[in-house]
């Protein structure tokens, strides 16, 4: 039995779960999420909890067991409390601003990059520049991506980070707040 897959998922009071064959729909205060599970996994409701079981003992079924349980648990967590991904942008002239549902990023290119926010995702931008830890004296901005779908929050965060990943000499670029960048020493020069 999968160590993760065998754990029950508690259903909070304000969450409504609908099971329809392989399809799971979770509705809560923050929104609605649905998921179609693989054939090898099924979800059963028992005593106000959800149990994820596998239909066979094949390697594929064992792999999908823990994954299916984690996906359903993330859906329940998402519609109740939501997910956040704090990020930072550091560098001279690097800025991030939110106008309506459009995020504008100035990251050292000749033009600003605009990203339309997907439905169910919000971004909170700290308007004050502050020193960014883990860089060599770089000022920057903090912003937080929020949403009830963990996958959508992570996808948007990765898309934003890919615009200008942190460089290894001064740490300039866009990074996750918890990310540690190993800074390299520059050239030593002539001796």
Curated annotation (Swiss-Prot):
GO biological process: cytoplasmic translation
Any one cellular-component term (Gene Ontology): cytosolic large ribosomal subunit
InterPro entries, per the entry: Ribosomal_uL6-like, Ribosomal_uL6-like_a/b-dom_sf, Ribosomal_uL6_a/b-dom, Ribosomal_uL6_bac-type, Ribosomal_uL6_CS
Keyword Cell membrane among UniProt keywords: no
Keyword Repeat: no
GO MF term list: rRNA binding; structural constituent of ribosome
Keywords: Ribonucleoprotein, Ribosomal protein, RNA-binding, rRNA-binding
Superkingdom assignment: Bacteria
PROSITE patterns: RIBOSOMAL_L6_1
Pfam families for the chain: Ribosomal_L6
HAMAP family for the chain: Ribosomal_uL6_B (MF_01365_B)
Quaternary structure, from the entry: Part of the 50S ribosomal subunit.
Function: This protein binds to the 23S rRNA, and is important in its secondary structure. It is located near the subunit interface in the base of the L7/L12 stalk, and near the tRNA binding site of the peptidyltransferase center.
NCBIfam families: L6_bact
Family stated for the protein in its record: Belongs to the universal ribosomal protein uL6 family.
PANTHER family: 60S/50S RIBOSOMAL PROTEIN L6/L9, LARGE RIBOSOMAL SUBUNIT PROTEIN UL6M
Protein name: Large ribosomal subunit protein uL6
């Amino acid at each position: 039995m999968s160590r993760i897959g065998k754990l029950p998922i508690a259903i909070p009071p304000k969450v409504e779960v609908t099971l329809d064959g392989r399809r799971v729909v979770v509705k809560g205060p923050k929104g609605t999420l649905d998921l179609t599970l693989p054939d090898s996994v099924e979800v059963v409701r028992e005593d106000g909890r959800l149990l994820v079981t596998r239909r066979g003992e094949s390697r594929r079924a064992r792999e999908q067991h823990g994954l299916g349980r984690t996906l359903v648990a993330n859906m329940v967590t998402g519609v109740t409390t939501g997910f956040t991904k704090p990020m930072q942008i550091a560098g001279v002239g690097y800025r991030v601003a939110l106008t309506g549902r459009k995020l504008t990023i100035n990251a050292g290119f000749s033009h600003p990059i605009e990203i339309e926010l997907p439905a169910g995702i919000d971004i909170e931008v700290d308007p004050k520049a502050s020193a960014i830890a883990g860089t060599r004296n770089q000022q920057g901005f903090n912003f937080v991506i929020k949403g009830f779908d963990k996958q959508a929050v992570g996808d948007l965060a990765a898309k934003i980070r890919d615009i200008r990943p942190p460089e290894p000499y001064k740490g300039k670029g866009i990074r996750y707040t918890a990310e540690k960048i190993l800074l390299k020493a520059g050239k030593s020069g002539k001796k």
